[in-house]
Amino acid sequence: MDFHLSKAEESLQKKVEAFVREELIPLEPEFEGAPDIFEGSRWKSRAKLSCDPEVHRYIKIMERLEKKAEAEGLWYLDVPKEYGGLDISNVGMIAVTEELEKTSIPFELGNHVSNILYNCQGEQIERFLLPCIRGEKTSAFGLSEPASGADPSMLQTTATPDGDDFIINGTKMFPTFADR
């Protein structure tokens, strides 16, 4: 495996570094007083369920930042070019993550489509993948279960075919983005 960044990845790393320095770090003092719900990278799932107007004020700030990042080409980073992404390598994504970790603001770049990206086929690409990439839909991910934790070999949830649909039967503990 080549651990060197391509010229495009080096350029992207510098863009992310500038975004963090110019957009995120200046907001750190304001976010120091933010509700605890914004701790960690999975704040979206919890924050959207809140009735607290203060939480929704921070959500608006984050949504503005997401739109700015997308406008600057800092979105769809690991999505293949054929779907409108930048097709950044794993090493490139590590460089991006290193830059994002230089701020205490819990900010991520992208819509988390990697879980469905390589498994969608035919009509599923148009129905699920592309709307997620465009930000029209959000994918949810549920691995953890009460009896198995996050061990995929011990999963008990089943998906039984039922005509054109599936009947899903089981319990998940921490389904990411299930509220969307």
In which residue ranges do the predicted regions lie?
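Intrinsic disorder at enzyme termini
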Residues: 1-16, 159
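Short amphipathic alpha-helical coiled-coil/interface segments
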Residues: 16-17, 69
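Surface-exposed helix-capping loop/turn segments at secondary-structure junctions
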Residues: 24-31
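Glycine-rich flavin
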Residues: 31-180
